[in-house]
C-alpha cells in the first residue's frame, strides 16, 4: 500500500511517498483534516506559513493519536522572507505555531517573493542567507 511506502533521501531520512497537503484548508478546519488523514494511514503532513493554518495543523498532530516521531511534517518559509534573520525568526515561529520540537522538512516556499515572481532578480544571494538559517536548525 503506497501510504506505507517511503523515499530515502541522501541523508538517510525517509519521507513518505504520499502526504496530506493542507493548502486552502482553513486553520479552524485543518486539525480535523489532519486527524482523518492520519486515521486513513497518512504519515506525511505538508503545510506552509503562507497557508496560515500551522496552528490548526499542530492541533491535528497533537490529537491524531499517532506518536510525533511516526509522522513526517513539512512546512515552508514564506517566499518573501529573504534574509538570514527573517528565515531564523520564521523557523522559530513555525515551531511555536505547530507546537513541535522539530520539523522534519523545512523548505523555502519559492525562490522569489510571490510579488516579484518572474522579475530579473532571482534572489540567489538572499536564498543562500535563508539556507544558512535552515542549516543552523537542521538536526539529524
Describe the function of each predicted region:
Residues 68-81, 102-111:
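A short, structured active-site edge motif that brings together acidic residues
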Residues 24-26, 51, 81, 109-114:
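Feature marks short, surface-exposed loop/turn motifs that line or immediately flank catalytic pockets
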Residues 16-28, 77-85, 118-123:
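Active-site mouth loops of central-metabolism enzymes
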Residues 54-55, 70, 81-83, 115:
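Short active-site-adjacent helix-start/loop capping segments
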Residues 88-140:
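Glycine/proline-rich, positively charged
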Residues 1-71, 88, 101, 133-139:
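N-terminal binding-site loop/beta-alpha segment at the start of enzyme catalytic domains
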Amino acid at each position: 500500500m503506497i501510504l506505507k511506502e517511503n523515499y530515502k533521501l541522501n541523508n538517510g531520512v525517509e519521507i513518505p511517498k504520499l502526504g496530506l497537503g493542507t493548502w486552502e484548508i482553513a486553520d479552524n478546519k485543518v486539525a480535523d483534516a489532519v486527524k482523518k488523514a492520519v486515521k486513513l494511514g497518512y504519515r506525511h503532513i505538508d503545510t506552509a506559513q503562507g497557508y496560515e493554518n500551522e496552528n490548526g495543523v499542530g492541533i491535528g498532530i497533537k490529537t491524531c493519536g499517532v506518536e510525533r516521531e511516526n509522522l513526517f511534517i513539512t512546512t515552508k518559509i514564506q517566499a518573501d522572507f529573504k534574509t538570514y534573520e527573517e528565515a531564523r525568526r520564521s523557523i522559530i515561529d513555525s515551531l511555536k505555531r505547530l507546537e513541535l520540537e522539530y520539523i522534519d522538512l523545512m523548505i523555502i516556499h519559492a525562490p522569489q517573493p510571490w510579488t516579484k515572481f518572474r522579475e530579473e532578480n532571482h534572489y540567489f544571494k538572499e536564498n543562500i542567507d535563508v539556507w544558512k538559517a535552515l542549516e543552523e536548525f537542521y538536526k539529524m
